[in-house]
């Protein structure tokens, strides 16, 4: 096998592995972004734990066929980049939707959420969800609230006991 063919097979396998293991992959048409905007986008995605890769449509189509993602091929027209997120489905959706709002030409094509193809509306809905960190903070707050209430109740009982004992002490001093 020649080197060019080996490189294509390796690239196809890499795309297939990432599409198969990612929680969310978003395909986008990155036309119209200048180098500074593309660098900023890559940095934002990297900080969120998302890999952003420009891919060849033919290799992506081959990888999608091997994974059984038949509905992906019609979206593989024009320049394509894929944002692969292995952990958080909300972060790439938020970041890419923000770029769509700020750019005239950048477009989200389609997404793959845990092996199922999702449209632009579903990706926008994902971007409206709170991030993983926000959800964890709310969950911790939810666990803390009952504990704080219990501490206040117990402290209130102790405080009332101290007030009662103080009142008894003052009463005995007044009698004596």
Curated annotation (Swiss-Prot):
Keywords: Ribonucleoprotein, Ribosomal protein, RNA-binding, rRNA-binding. It comes from the Bacteria. One of its GO terms (biological process) is translation. The keyword Ribosomal protein applies. PROSITE patterns: RIBOSOMAL_L10. GO terms for molecular function: large ribosomal subunit rRNA binding; structural constituent of ribosome. InterPro entries: Ribosomal_uL10 (IPR001790), Ribosomal_uL10-like_sf (IPR043141), Ribosomal_uL10_bac (IPR022973), Ribosomal_uL10_bac_type (IPR047865), Ribosomal_uL10_CS_bac (IPR002363). One of its GO terms (cellular component) is large ribosomal subunit. Pfam families: Ribosomal_L10. Forms part of the ribosomal stalk, playing a central role in the interaction of the ribosome with GTP-bound translation factors. Part of the ribosomal stalk of the 50S ribosomal subunit. The N-terminus interacts with L11 and the large rRNA to form the base of the stalk. The C-terminus forms an elongated spine to which L12 dimers bind in a sequential fashion forming a multimeric L10(L12)X complex. Belongs to the universal ribosomal protein uL10 family. This is Large ribosomal subunit protein uL10. It comes from Moorella thermoacetica (strain ATCC 39073 / JCM 9320).
């Amino acid at each position: 096998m020649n080197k060019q063919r080996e490189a294509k097979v390796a690239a196809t396998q890499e795309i297939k592995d990432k599409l198969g293991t990612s929680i969310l992959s978003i395909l986008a048409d990155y036309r119209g972004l200048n180098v500074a905007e593309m660098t900023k986008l890559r940095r934002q995605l990297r900080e969120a734990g998302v890999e952003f890769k420009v891919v060849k449509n033919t290799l992506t189509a081959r990888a999608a066929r091997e994974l059984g993602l038949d509905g992906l091929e019609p979206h593989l027209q024009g320049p394509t980049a894929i944002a692969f997120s292995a952990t958080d489905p909300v972060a790439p959706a938020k970041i890419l939707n923000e770029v769509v709002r700020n750019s005239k030409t950048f477009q989200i094509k389609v997404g793959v959420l845990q092996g199922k193809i999702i449209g632009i509306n579903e990706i926008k809905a994902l971007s409206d969800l709170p991030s993983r960190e926000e959800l964890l903070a709310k969950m911790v707050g939810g666990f803390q609230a009952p504990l704080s209430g219990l501490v206040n109740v117990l402290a209130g009982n102790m405080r009332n006991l101290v007030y009662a004992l103080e009142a008894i002490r003052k009463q005995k001093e007044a009698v004596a």
